[in-house]
Regions:
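Active-site-proximal or metal-binding-adjacent scaffold patches in catalytic folds
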Residues: 1-130, 140-191
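Walker B catalytic acidic pair
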Residues: 136
Length: 191
């Protein structure tokens, strides 16, 4: 019985240690920078272009706020739009650490939106980042997890409206794939 308690304690302490190590690794490579675009604080990687990274997040933040507000204005009773409006917090956009396993992702349907901002060491194009962020908005608004048909339909709807209001410029990823953070974007729901 005593051995089980000791084993259990060691396992719990190991998990806590691994978590703290991850937190240290993450936050030791991240700094908070004030964007010149909107004077807001953004968490970005400690790199020479950190100011540019903060400004890039500020630019995409503005586009996403416009899109979410537009969607709520034209479809205020749509369940996905209502969920998106409720759960989207533009103040949780931040850059993630360099990790080939992750590009951009949403935590708990909008609790955090972690962005990959660099491909091959250079800041990504704002239109590509906007496409990726609209993909993340689709996850926030969609009730299910993953990429089911409802997700793709909502993603397409958001892209169409983003184009209509000038937030996103349509791009044919099938014709000209784009490298984004260790992966290739090869298609879009609009194709």
């Amino acid at each position: 019985m005593e051995l089980n308690n000791i084993t259990f304690t060691i396992i719990i302490l190991s998990i806590i240690f691994i978590y703290l190590l991850y937190q240290y690794h993450y936050y030791s490579n991240i700094e908070t920078i004030v964007s010149k675009i909107d004077n807001r604080n953004y968490d970005v990687q400690i790199k020479e272009d950190a100011n540019g990274a903060a400004d890039l997040i500020a630019q995409v933040r503005e586009k996403l706020v416009l899109l979410v507000n537009h969607m709520f204005k034209i479809l205020p009773t749509n369940p996905k739009v209502m969920r998106l409006k409720k759960n989207f917090n533009p103040d949780v956009l931040k850059e993630g650490i360099d990790n080939p396993s992750y590009t951009s992702y949403t935590v708990n349907k909008g609790e955090e939106i972690i962005l990959c901002l660099r491909t091959d060491g250079k800041l990504v194009d704002i239109n590509v980042l906007t496409f990726v962020c609209i993909h993340e908005l689709s996850h926030i608004g969609n009730e299910t997890i993953g990429h089911d048909d409802a997700f793709w339909e909502f993603f397409k709807e958001l892209l169409i409206e983003a184009i209509n209001i000038g937030v996103y410029i349509k791009y044919d990823y099938r014709k000209s794939p784009v490298k984004y953070c260790g992966m290739m974007i090869t298609d879009s729901p609009l194709d």
